Amino acid sequence: MKRLFIDLDGTVAKFNVRNALERFDKEKGFFAKLGAYANIEVINELAKTNKVFVISASPNEQADKDKLVWLSKFLPNVNSTNITLCRLGENKAKIIESKYNITINEDCYLLDDFSKNLFEWCACGGRGIKRLTSLADNSRGLWKGWAIKNLIELQDFFA
């Protein structure tokens, strides 16, 4: 069975790293106030029938709380046991393997806007999907794998 692991900031939540670096560490509620990208309902629908997980890095505990508020608003169908919040710079694949006692394999897909996370995920045996947005790193950079501009592109593959 395919499993979809999704990042939040810059992937499904509108996060502009250039404008946020000074703010998110100081502004309470910063992450809770972020908007969602178009077609977020695709992820929410997939969460009803598929294994959908959230793996998002946070700078601090306040950001963790804010992200949980955001998730309850925009992705209420994601089971709370399928939400993992880690610290910036941690290897998402290793965190998931440890938390869920699973081995990342070719049926485990990470949707992320940050190529470093995708390379680490693939090195552990999973598959990566690069999220291209105008607010985040809109280039493929060194990433040569699957890339999407719109969340609706996931609908048929994971249906």
Question: What role is predicted for each listed range?
Answer:
Residues K94-T103, W146-A159:
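Short amphipathic alpha-helix with an adjacent loop that forms part of the alpha/beta core around
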Residues N105-K149:
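Acidic, Mg2+-coordinating phosphoryl-transfer loop and its flanking beta/alpha structural elements
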Residues A13-N16, E61-K65, K92-K94, N117-E120, ...:
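Short catalytic/ligand-binding loop motif for oxyanion handling, primarily in non-cytosolic enzymes
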Residues D7, I55-A57, L111:
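Short hydrophobic segments within beta-strands
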Residues E22-F53, E61-K65:
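Short, acidic loop-to-helix structural element flanking the phosphoryl-transfer center
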